[in-house]
């Protein structure tokens, strides 16, 4: 009965989508694959998870209850920055990291534009039709959202989420995280070359398709 009460067990229950692999779930929640394999095996033996052409949660009400528990826990221990990056995986809606977070994801964490831990925005693209639902989701964790970055002085906490609504989302996955396509990410970095020159050099070494020889337009932009 208590198999789902551990931290990693709860994260697996919340992040699992029908058809997921063990590796896919591990990447989603930024955990070691072997650790998650043992967790999934335990959940499968207890009857919470089944494998049929991918992993499946037996009873979706368990996921709903887990999210309620996580919400209550956040009242006592608010999400850290690293935990905030995992939270969108639990929303059950399509999204993709965009802007400076797309650069961060495509460089596999190798390039992080200066962001103060006390004033830390996350940037995600969402469906226009899901905008209100995303706002409600982050409200459960008392994380403010807006379509443009809010001044730190207007916030009670350090984390905010900047939602970028789109009619459609084209997403790729890098290390389990959904992110806008590489071509779009490079175009964004080119547009803000003054901030992302080093990132473009890094992307050029990581991916053969990246062209870093364009005529860049330097801008002074507050993200």
Model-derived features: positions:
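Alpha-helix N-cap/N′ positions at the starts of helices
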Residues: 7-8, 20, 181
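Short amphipathic alpha-helical interaction segments
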Residues: 30-45
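Active-site nucleotide-donor binding segment shared across nucleotidyl transfer reactions
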Residues: 73-138
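Short, cationic-aromatic polyanion-contact patches
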Residues: 1-9, 54-75
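Phosphate-handling catalytic interfaces
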Residues: 111-223
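A short, conserved structural fragment
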Residues: 44-54
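Short acidic, hydrophobic short linear motifs in intrinsically disordered regions
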Residues: 16-29
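Short alpha-helical "packing" element that flanks the helix-turn-helix/winged-helix DNA-binding module
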Residues: 8-12, 16
């Amino acid at each position: 009965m208590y198999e789902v009460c551990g931290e990693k067990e709860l994260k697996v229950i919340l992040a699992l989508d029908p058809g997921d692999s063990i590796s896919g779930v591990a990447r989603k929640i930024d955990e070691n694959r072997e650790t998650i394999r043992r967790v999934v095996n335990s959940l499968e033996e207890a009857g919470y998870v089944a494998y049929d052409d991918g992993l499946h949660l037996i009873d979706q009400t368990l996921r709903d209850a887990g999210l309620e528990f996580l919400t209550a826990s956040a009242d006592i221990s608010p999400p850290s920055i690293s935990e905030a990056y995992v939270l969108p995986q639990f929303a059950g809606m399509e999204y993709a990291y965009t802007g400076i977070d797309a650069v961060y994801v495509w460089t596999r964490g190798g390039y992080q534009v200066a962001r103060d831990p006390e004033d830390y925005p996350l940037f995600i693209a969402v469906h226009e039709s899901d905008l209100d639902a995303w706002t409600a989701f982050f409200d459960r964790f008392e994380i403010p959202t807006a379509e443009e970055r809010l001044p730190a002085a207007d916030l009670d906490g350090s984390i905010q989420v900047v939602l970028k609504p789109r009619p459609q989302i084209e997403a790729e996955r890098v290390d389990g995280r959904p992110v806008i396509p590489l071509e779009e990410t490079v175009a964004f970095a080119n547009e803000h070359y003054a901030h992302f020159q080093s990132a473009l050099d890094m992307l050029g070494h990581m991916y053969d398709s990246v062209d870093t020889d364009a005529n860049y337009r330097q801008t002074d932009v507050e993200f």
